[in-house]
């Protein structure tokens, strides 16, 4: 059975708001336009998604401190989770996932803190989410150190934890840190993660990478992004996603064609990341749910 996940949140919010990207990314919408977040969740469920991923990716101390309100983490975490829950309840079925983004910055594993610093941060985050979500998902983990720190903290939760790793867009056999993807597999078993996915990488890289997960004992999956590449200038908190260009060739049909290859390689969890929207999820749902 194939489980259809939702698609990207941040880029979809920018598209719908009609404004420019802001340094606070999807957090800006949580503060100023929560109804837009609700609409995105609703549209993903209507497109066939079985999971609403709460808009909590950037609700972490380093991001909040940078923007001047570190004391609001629990409040914002709860607000985002409740929006996802309401969408699930409106739809009448589905699950809610609590997103946990990388510390430091996305795609920049060299900026992540040491494991003994990261683990308690994620432990706090899952405590704030666990009352509301069905499971947590560590996203865009780009090095073995990021994975270990994330899993060490997140698996303190009583709820299941999924792990999603991001790979090099040229060499899909390697994490963005340069380490081999297979180095993550022992950590999945050590910490008891319930699923292992590839995320926020090009569909081509994921197609090369997913066969390397075949030895994993838990369900595997993938959700790619629709960026041309990850610009070197997109490298710090405060950078805006308008530094990243959208691919024009990644139509829903072509994206689903890539997903066919992932399923053939053993994936059972399929969705989308940045620049992959409701139309893409609808095509996935049509192919696998009929």
Predicted regions, residues:
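Domain-level signal for soluble alpha/beta catalytic cores
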Residues: 1-290
């Amino acid at each position: 059975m194939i489980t259809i996940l939702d698609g990207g949140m941040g880029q979809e919010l920018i598209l719908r708001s009609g404004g420019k990207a802001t340094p606070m990314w999807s957090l800006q919408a949580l503060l100023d336009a929560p109804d837009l977040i609700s609409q995105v969740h609703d549209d993903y469920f209507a497109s066939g998604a079985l999971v609403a991923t709460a808009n909590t990716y950037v609700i972490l101390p380093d991001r909040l401190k940078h923007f001047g309100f570190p004391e609001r983490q629990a409040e914002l975490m709860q607000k985002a989770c409740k929006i996802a829950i309401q969408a699930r309840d409106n739809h009448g079925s589905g699950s809610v996932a609590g997103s946990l983004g990388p510390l430091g910055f996305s795609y920049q594993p060299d900026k992540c803190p040491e494991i003994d610093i990261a683990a308690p941060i994620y432990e706090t985050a899952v405590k704030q989410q666990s009352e509301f979500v069905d499971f947590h998902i560590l996203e865009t983990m780009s090095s073995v150190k990021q994975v270990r720190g994330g899993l060490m903290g997140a698996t303190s939760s009583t709820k299941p934890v999924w792990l999603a790793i991001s790979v090099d867009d040229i060499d899909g056999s390697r994490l963005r840190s340069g380490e081999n993807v297979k180095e993550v597999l022992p950590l999945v078993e050590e910490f008891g993660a319930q699923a292992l996915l590839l995320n926020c990488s090009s569909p081509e890289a994921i197609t090369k990478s997913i066969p390397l997960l075949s030895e994993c004992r838990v369900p595997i999956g993938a959700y790619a992004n629709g960026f041309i590449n990850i610009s070197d200038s997109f490298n710090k908190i405060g950078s805006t996603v308008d530094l990243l260009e959208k691919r024009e060739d990644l139509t829903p049909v072509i994206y689903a064609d890539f997903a066919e290859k992932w399923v053939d390689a053993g994936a059972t969890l399929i969705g989308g990341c940045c620049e992959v929207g409701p139309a893409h999820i609808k095509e996935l749902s049509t192919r696998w749910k009929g």
